[in-house]
C-alpha cells in the first residue's frame, strides 16, 4: 500500500512540460513586394513529429488555411516556404496583410495543442498625391487647398511649402490653418499665399522616401477700375436705348391706325377691307366729286358732256 502511494506521489511530483508555441516577432511590418518571415517556435513533451498548421484571418475576419496537410494551399502554394514551423512569404502585397495563427498539435503530450498569433502589416509608400487646388482666387475669398494620398500605409503626413519654406503646423501668428493628417490648408481671408505652393508627404517612423507634388496657386486683387467702367458702360447703353425709344415715339412710329379694318377669309388667302371701302361716301365728301344718281329700274343713257 505504501508503495502505491509513493508511486502516485512520485508521478505527480515529476514536472510535466506540455507543448508550447511562441513567436520571436509577433508583429511583422515589411514593405510591399518584399519577403516576410512569420516566426513560430514550439516545444513538445513527447511527440517528436507534431502536426503543424497555419491559418490566416483577413480584414473581413474570414479564416482560411495557409499551411495544411504538410503543404501550402491557396495563393501561397508557389511563394511560401516552411522551416520547422516558421513560414517565409515571398513578395507580399496588401492582400497578404492580416493576422496569422500557428497551431501545433502533439497528440502524445498531456496538453496536445498550442498556438501563437503573428500580425503582418504591409507598408505601402506614398504615391504622387492628388491635388485639389484652384488655379487662382480673389484676395479675401475663402478657399481650401487639399492634398491627399488614399493608398499609403501608414497614412501619409503632409507638409505644405511656400516659396520652398515649410509652413509651421502651429504658429502663434499664423495666417492659415494646416492639418498635417488630412492635408488641408485653409488660408485666412487676408492672407496671400503667394504664387507657388508645394506640398509633400513623408513617413518619419518608417523611413519611406518623401513624395512631393508642386502646384501653382495665384491670388488676384479685385480690379475696381474695371468694375466701375463696366457699370458706367451698362448705364450709358441703357440711357441710349431709352432715348431712342422716346425719339421714335415722338416721330409717330408707335401711333396706331385710326381706321377700322376687317379680315375676311378667301379661298386662297385673306382679303383686307378697310373702313374707307365700306363707306365710300365719307371719302368722296372730301374729294369734291359726287356720283350722279342712279335709277336701277328705268335706266337711260344720259349725256355726260356738252359740246
From Swiss-Prot:
SUPFAM superfamilies found in the cross-reference section: Immunoglobulin
Record keyword RNA-binding present: no
GO biological process, one term: cell-cell adhesion
UniProt feature coiled coil, ranges: none
Family matches, as PANTHER family: JUNCTIONAL ADHESION MOLECULE 2A, JUNCTIONAL ADHESION MOLECULE B
Function: Junctional adhesion protein that mediates heterotypic cell-cell interactions to regulate different cellular processes. During myogenesis, it is involved in myocyte fusion through the binding of jam3b on neighboring myocytes.
Protein's recorded name: Junctional adhesion molecule 2A
Amino acid at each position: 500500500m505504501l508503495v502505491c502511494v509513493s508511486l502516485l506521489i512520485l508521478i505527480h511530483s515529476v514536472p510535466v512540460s506540455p507543448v508550447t508555441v511562441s513567436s520571436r516577432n509577433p508583429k511583422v511590418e515589411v514593405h510591399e513586394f518584399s519577403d516576410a518571415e512569420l516566426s513560430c517556435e514550439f516545444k513538445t513533451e513527447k511527440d517528436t513529429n507534431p502536426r503543424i498548421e497555419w491559418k490566416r484571418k483577413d480584414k473581413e475576419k474570414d479564416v482560411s488555411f495557409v499551411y495544411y496537410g504538410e503543404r501550402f494551399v491557396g495563393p501561397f502554394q508557389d511563394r511560401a516556404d516552411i522551416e520547422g514551423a516558421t513560414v517565409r512569404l515571398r513578395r507580399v502585397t496588401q492582400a497578404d496583410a492580416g493576422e496569422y495563427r500557428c497551431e501545433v498539435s502533439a497528440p502524445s503530450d498531456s496538453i496536445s495543442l498550442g498556438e501563437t498569433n503573428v500580425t503582418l502589416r504591409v507598408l505601402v509608400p506614398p504615391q504622387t498625391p492628388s491635388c485639389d487646388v484652384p488655379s487662382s482666387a480673389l484676395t479675401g475669398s475663402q478657399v481650401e487647398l487639399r492634398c491627399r494620398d488614399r493608398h499609403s500605409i501608414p497614412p501619409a503626413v503632409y507638409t505644405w511649402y511656400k516659396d520652398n519654406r515649410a509652413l509651421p503646423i502651429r504658429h502663434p501668428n499664423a495666417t492659415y490653418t494646416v492639418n498635417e493628417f488630412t492635408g488641408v490648408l485653409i488660408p485666412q481671408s487676408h492672407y496671400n499665399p503667394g504664387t507657388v505652393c508645394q506640398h509633400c508627404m513623408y513617413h518619419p517612423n518608417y523611413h519611406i522616401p518623401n513624395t512631393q507634388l508642386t502646384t501653382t496657386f495665384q491670388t488676384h486683387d479685385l480690379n475696381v477700375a474695371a468694375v466701375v467702367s463696366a457699370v458706367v458702360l451698362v448705364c450709358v447703353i441703357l440711357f441710349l436705348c431709352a432715348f431712342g425709344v422716346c425719339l421714335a415715339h415722338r416721330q409717330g412710329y408707335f401711333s396706331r391706325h385710326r381706321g377700322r379694318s376687317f379680315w375676311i377669309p378667301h379661298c386662297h388667302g385673306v382679303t383686307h377691307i378697310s373702313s374707307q371701302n365700306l363707306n365710300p361716301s365719307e371719302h368722296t365728301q372730301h374729294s369734291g366729286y359726287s356720283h350722279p344718281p342712279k335709277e336701277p329700274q328705268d335706266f337711260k343713257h344720259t349725256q355726260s358732256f356738252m359740246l
